[in-house]
Structures are given as C-alpha cells and as structure tokens.
C-alpha cells in the first residue's frame, strides 16, 4: 500500500462512524487475531508491518467491521 498511515487512519475512523473508541476496539481485536495466526485480508507481510497498521488498512478497505469481529468470536 502506498498511502500514508495518517490517511488510512482517517479513512478507517470514517468507516467507524468517527467513533475513536469503536475504531480502537476493532483495531485491537483484529491485531490480536493477526498475532494469533489469522491471515491478513490485505496484501501485507505480517512480519514486516505492524499488526495495528494492517488492521487499519483492513478497516479502511471495508474488509473488517465490528459486527464481523463479534460474529467470529461466537
């Protein structure tokens, strides 16, 4: 990805209805899943990129939602 992380974070925040708490919750949960072996839904190397950055890109690209994370934990 060639976007600056600030731009990606702003887009991800917009996707979460500008709710910073919700965004941080989704990023943390998705980063935990990635740390536990989940495959990134965007083209990133987990070993070369921060897991939180990967999660932000996934949210910004509509690959991950809070509702989707809740469903996978049930």
Swiss-Prot record:
A molecular function GO annotation: DNA binding
Entry protein name: DNA-directed RNA polymerase subunit omega
Top EC class of this enzyme: transferase
Disulfide bridges in this chain: none
InterPro entries tied to this protein: DNA-dir_RNA_pol_omega, Pol_omega/Rpo6/RPB6, RPB6/omega-like_sf
The protein's Enzyme Commission number: 2.7.7.6
Gene Ontology cellular-component annotations: DNA-directed RNA polymerase complex
Role description: Promotes RNA polymerase assembly. Latches the N- and C-terminal regions of the beta' subunit thereby facilitating its interaction with the beta and alpha subunits.
UniProt record, GO biological process: DNA-templated transcription
Annotated gene: rpoZ
Lineage start: Bacteria, Pseudomonadati, Campylobacterota, Epsilonproteobacteria, Campylobacterales
Pfam families per the UniProt record, alphabetical: RNA_pol_Rpb6
Keyword annotations of the record: DNA-directed RNA polymerase, Nucleotidyltransferase, Transcription, Transferase
Similarity-based family: Belongs to the RNA polymerase subunit omega family.
Catalytic reaction list: RNA(n) + a ribonucleoside 5'-triphosphate = RNA(n+1) + diphosphate
Domain of life, per lineage: Bacteria
NCBIfam families assigned: PRK00392.6-2, rpoZ
Subunit: The RNAP catalytic core consists of 2 alpha, 1 beta, 1 beta' and 1 omega subunit. When a sigma factor is associated with the core the holoenzyme is formed, which can initiate transcription.
